[in-house]
Amino acid sequence: MTLVREGKYKEALEIILEKNPLPFITGTICYHTCMDSCTRNFYESPVEIRRNKLIAAEKGYDAVMAELMPPEGCGKKAAIIGAGPAGLSAAYFLARGGVDVTVFEKNDVAGGIVRSFLCDKKGQITADAIGKDISLIEKMGVRIETGRDISRADELAGFDYVLAACGVKGLMGGAKPADIPGLIVIGDGHYGKTTSVVECIADGKRAAEAILNMPVSVDTELAADEEAVYSQRGQLIMAPEAGCDRRCLQCDAVCEVCTEVCPNRANMAVPVPGLLHRQIIHLDALCNECGNCRSFCPWQGAPYKDKLTVFRTGADMDDSTNPGILLVQPETGRFRVRMDGMMTEYTVGGSEPSLLEEPVRKLIDTLFKDYSYVLW
């Protein structure tokens, strides 16, 4: 959202392509349920996320295509039956991993139900938009052979991996792909029901990661101007009817909703030297577990259970399963710490090795030195 707002369309599209190889299709016909979690819902209306991503695709396409190159091959070959969203997704991510990929599509054009139904019959998306996504995938070195109806698995001898993305009702020689040994079934055929384009993309990506035995994408974290983010709070701005929606509150970079909605002020944002963003801590003694923070959280979390919890007594800590800390020796800065279900101890400024990750140590150090009033 930030890059689109700043007019950096190429960079925005490159981030989208890390996890979504069909930006034109999803930017046009996805159900955009991401907008249900947008913090702007609590102000006036959600940010037009899908629209902004389509703008990135449309305006960043030529620049990305000019630089897109297939990676060095790994020596493996994969055949994918079906050029719908799941098959195209798997093809893209396998190709990114260096696999030589060929997609076989029985129809005369690729795109699956998006092309045959949503485009040709419903008119919800243009053939040109679908074609641009397919061109992106082909630019990664993927070959797509249309008019190829594969009826037997032995037709694909010589491939190291064979994936079937034939849809929920798709058959191979009268048999369900799931009943044919050696086939990796993805998409709606894997789910056993008609799903969404986004779910099919995700399944294709999961299949590629399982085959490659490694992640095929990375998370991109952009630094935010926190003062600019804070300055937008409380401003009621309706979404524009067209064009870029600039109202994003950048919850991916600065999210402190749980500190604002807690009626007991049991969640607190703490600036920690050396860390990019303020860190959320949970104050056990102030929480009555009303669940407000979970209801308003735009992420899939429950801050009153997930965030590092500051306990006042050993009994309170023993009665909880939260990750958390308890100051046991104020004079030496010694803490009892629970992380990932394991108990350990940590001393601020101590010389002994610690099992705690550096961000956790920095947070504990900051609390002890600058926010000691929350520790007892």
Task: Show where each model-derived region lies.
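Residue-level detector of alpha-helix initiation sites
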Residues: P21, G84-P85, V109, H190-Y191, ...
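Domain-exit/linker segments immediately C-terminal to small folded modules
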Residues: P298, P303-E345
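Extended alpha-helical scaffolding regions
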Residues: R338-W376
